[in-house]
Every structure is written in C-alpha cells, then in structure tokens.
Amino acid sequence: MKKLLLIAAASTALLTSGLSFADCDMNSSVDSSTNSSMSSSVENQWYLKLNAGGVIFNKTKPKGADFKLNNIKSNIKSNTGFTGEIGAGYYIMDNLRTDLTIGTVASSHLKKSKTYPDGNSFSVKNKPTIVSVLLNGYVDFVDLSMFKVFAGAGVGAAFVKEKIHSKDIKGGVTDTFNGTTKNKTNFAYQLSLGTSFEVAQGVKAELVYSWRDYGKTKNTTKTINGDKVKFGGTHYKGHNLMAGLRFDM
C-alpha cells in the first residue's frame, strides 16, 4: 500500500506541474481563440490512451492439501506489482466516452511462509500472468473546463494463469514443488474513479484508481511420485492506481 501511495504522490505532482504549465501558457497568450480551442467540444471524436501504474491484490486463502498438512490457515499476501493498459475510445458526448482497452499485470506475486519451533518451515509463492480485454464507459461528473473528475465501469474477459513454487523443510529434508496452471478465460470487470486535465491541445493527463476482478485461476491436479497434488484456484482481484495520457484524434 505504501508503494501505491508513493505512486499516487508522484503522479499527482506530475499532473499538478502539468496543470501549472498549461495555466501559465494560457495566461501569457493574447489570442483568445487558443483558450477556446483548449476547451472545445470533443463530441464525436476518437482518442488513444496509455496508462501504467501499480496493483495490489487482495489477500486470499491458500489452496491445496499442502497448506492443510502444514497448518497454513492465514491468507497469502500480495506485493505491489506493475499494471498497464493501452486502448482506443470515442467521445459520445462532451462528458460521456467509451473505450476498449487491453491490459496486463506483471511482476506481481502472492507469498506466505511459516517457520515452526522445531526449525521446520514451509513457504509458497504464486506468480500470476494476466491479460485483460475490457469495454469501458466513463462519465465526467465534475467539469471545470480543463480539469475533470470522472467515474467509470467496464466488463470483459481476463486470461489468467499462475506459477506456484513451494518449499517444505522437515527434519533437514527439503521438498520443493513447482506447478503451472493452464490458461483460463474469466469474466472480468472494473470500477474506477479518476481525474484528468488538458496539458496541451488534444492531450489529457489522467490519474485513475480502479477496483478490478480478474477471476480465479484453473484448479489443477499434478501427480508427483504417485501422489496427486492439487493447486490453483487463486482469486485475483484488488486495487489499481494508474497514471497516463489520452490523445484526441
């Protein structure tokens, strides 16, 4: 969460400096037509967007028999991973727009470890690979010419799989397990709240928080030395914070 706050602070500073620059540029201009073009209508106009930032997934209960055998009952926790998306959209009205985005999650993992009084230990690490395709809609509910606040929602599909690595140390003997689930296609959705402002004619910077649910990975069974090991079924959903640019066409 601290990393997300740092991302938010840096993004806000960047956006504020851009707004100050745009404001100074407008004040120094003697051509009133420049001011009108900066806040001109964008209805029936296309745009491209690029966003990047951080993601923290919700804590989730561990799956599989190994967790029960090792008495792992608490949730496995997420680090702050990278998330980004690109998309193309259309302004239906001045305050209403829609877009189609392709997003990804990288450098993210869920991790848990436990050490026992006798020196034995158990650890697990889940690393997801997520690609999403979402159709989104946004409404500007605060419109101060160059500065806007908007809310949005989107639905689509997420392609989710994960790698799982566990290590079990008992009596000086180390057992490791590595497994990869098959790709699974899930229903995905997002709910978002953000701000944007125009830093140049046809270029808008935005800072967006979103809650995203990508669904669960595929439940998988793998036979190792005659034993069946079950893993997968991890639910990936959580908080996203991204900054980016929107280019009007």
UniProtKB/Swiss-Prot annotation:
It comes from the Bacteria. Pfam families: OMP_b-brl. The keyword GTP-binding does not apply. SUPFAM superfamilies: OMPA-like (SSF56925). Residues 1-22 form the signal peptide. Keywords: Signal. Adheres to biotinylated epithelial (Vero cell) proteins. This is Putative adhesin RC1281. It comes from Rickettsia conorii (strain ATCC VR-613 / Malish 7). The lineage of its organism: Bacteria, Pseudomonadati, Pseudomonadota, Alphaproteobacteria, Rickettsiales.
